[in-house]
């Protein structure tokens, strides 16, 4: 999870993580990207998106966080880190549309709030 990336990387790191998977035949994985929004006194609204892929046998690429270096999205042969080096927009698309979901929701929320305040 996002808030624990640095801690996980420091405690375990890519190479120890991949070592745990060295004999694993099922290397399927899911990358989930979530955003949450919460106003005081209200219930949080969560937006998520992502995709499926596989865990590589070795770390590849130089950009991104630890998981970017071994996660290969379905339909690709390169890790997210390698894709980012070549085409940032393509790499970003594999994170899903959680940010877009949030933006649409927030924009609509603000429009509704404005209209209700001014009785449109």
What do these predicted regions represent?
Residues 1-120:
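Anionic-ligand binding patches
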């Amino acid at each position: 999870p996002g808030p624990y990336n640095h801690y996980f990387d420091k405690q375990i790191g890519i190479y120890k993580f991949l070592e745990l998977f060295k004999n694993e035949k099922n290397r399927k994985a899911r990358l989930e990207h979530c955003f949450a929004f919460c106003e005081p006194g209200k219930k949080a609204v969560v937006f998520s998106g992502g995709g499926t892929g596989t865990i590589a046998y070795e770390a590849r690429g130089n950009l991104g966080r630890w998981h970017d270096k071994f996660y290969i999205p379905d339909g690709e042969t390169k890790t997210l880190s390698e894709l980012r080096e070549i085409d940032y927009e393509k790499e970003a698309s594999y994170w899903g549309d959680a940010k877009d979901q949030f933006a649409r929701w927030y924009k609509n929320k603000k429009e509704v709030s404005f209209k209700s305040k001014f009785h449109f």
